[in-house]
């Protein structure tokens, strides 16, 4: 009876975890980290509500790096050196936007947008870009579709892509990195976007520590659920062992019965 109850509790807990995981995966919230080169762009995004609005509003060339199935920040290691990522997240990010759904750029921008789908990273950015003429394109979108990337190679690849695009755009380039999941929160607790002043103060006073603050704040729902499940399973094990240790096992039924009246021959 007790084992039946424990088993039912285990199944219920497992079902809840699976339901949470499916729900989180279906929503696919995303966060965008945006770097502006032109101060004038701040005047055009005062009423933005999504990353797509930012892309539609800025008047400079835009490079968008979208990760469909890969949470970039969840995979960045604090103790590793990534030249581009460290510089970008610590010093270059001007605006952070949290979206309730994956990035969806307006179809009206298709004539001025070039899209590259990146499953496996090419050997170099030139292998991907040099065959295309991007002179008439204001938006270049890189869609990363894999769920795993070598971060050092990814760091080098994105840096090379931006160097190529900056040459084309005359160093006037807005950079958008869109990743699944967690969004940066500013000092006021606003997770939709941070103001330029807040981020500027953060960068000037903390410098390199800004990157560590961002990465060290990562705490995914999946990891939290794993810890909860582990705690519940440990509790179930302790209860089961306690119940077994309290069993009073009687061996009398196993002993061979003897008839004291029967005489020995």
UniProtKB/Swiss-Prot annotation:
Residues 1-24 form the signal peptide. Residues 25-223 are vacuolar. Coiled coil: none annotated. Residues 245-265 are cytoplasmic. Glycans are attached at residues 69, 104, 172. Keywords: Endoplasmic reticulum, Glycoprotein, Membrane, Signal, Transmembrane, Transmembrane helix, Vacuole. One of its GO terms (molecular function) is proton-transporting ATPase activity, rotational mechanism. GO terms for cellular component: endoplasmic reticulum membrane; fungal-type vacuole membrane; Golgi membrane; proton-transporting V-type ATPase complex; vacuolar proton-transporting V-type ATPase complex; vacuolar proton-transporting V-type ATPase, V0 domain. It is a single-pass type I membrane protein. InterPro entries: VAS1/VOA1_TM. Disruption phenotype: Reduces association of VMA6 with the V-type proton ATPase. Decreases VPH1 protein level. It is found in: Vacuole membrane; Endoplasmic reticulum membrane. A motif (ER retention motif) lies at residues 262-265. The chain crosses the membrane at residues 224-244. One of its GO terms (biological process) is protein-containing complex assembly. V-ATPase is a heteromultimeric enzyme composed of a peripheral catalytic V1 complex (components A to H) attached to an integral membrane V0 proton pore complex (components: a, c, c', c'', d, e, f and VOA1). Interacts with VMA21. Associates with the assembling V0 complex. Belongs to the VOA1 family. Present with 12764 molecules/cell in log phase SD medium. Accessory component of the V0 complex of vacuolar(H+)-ATPase (V-ATPase), a multisubunit enzyme composed of a peripheral complex (V1) that hydrolyzes ATP and a membrane integral complex (V0) that translocates protons. V-ATPase is responsible for acidifying and maintaining the pH of intracellular compartments. Functions with VMA21 in assembly of the V0 complex. This is V0 assembly protein 1. It comes from Saccharomyces cerevisiae (strain ATCC 204508 / S288c).
């Amino acid at each position: 009876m007790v084992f039946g109850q424990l088993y039912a509790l285990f199944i219920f807990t497992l079902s809840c975890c699976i339901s949470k995981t499916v729900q989180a995966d279906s929503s696919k919230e995303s966060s965008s980290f945006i770097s502006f080169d032109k101060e004038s762009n701040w005047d055009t995004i005062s009423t933005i509500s999504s990353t797509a609005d930012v892309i539609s509003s800025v008047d400079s060339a835009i490079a968008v790096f979208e990760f469909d199935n890969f949470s970039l920040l969840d995979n960045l290691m604090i103790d590793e050196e990534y030249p581009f990522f460290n510089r970008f997240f610590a010093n270059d990010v001007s605006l952070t936007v949290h979206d309730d759904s994956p990035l969806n750029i307006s179809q009206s921008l298709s004539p001025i947008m070039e899209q590259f789908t990146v499953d496996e990273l090419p050997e170099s950015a030139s292998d991907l870009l040099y065959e295309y003429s991007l002179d008439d394109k204001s938006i270049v979108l890189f869609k990363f579709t894999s769920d795993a990337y070598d971060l050092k190679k990814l760091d080098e690849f994105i840096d090379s892509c931006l160097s190529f695009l900056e040459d084309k755009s005359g160093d006037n380039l807005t950079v958008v990195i869109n990743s699944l999941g967690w969004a940066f929160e500013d000092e006021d607790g606003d997770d939709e976007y941070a103001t330029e002043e807040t981020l500027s103060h953060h960068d000037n006073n903390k410098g390199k520590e800004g990157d560590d603050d961002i990465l060290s704040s990562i705490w995914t729902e999946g990891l939290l659920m794993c810890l909860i499940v582990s705690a519940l399973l440990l509790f179930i094990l302790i209860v089961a062992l306690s119940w077994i240790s309290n069993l009073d096992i009687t061996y009398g039924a196993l002993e061979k019965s003897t008839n004291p009246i029967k005489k020995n021959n």
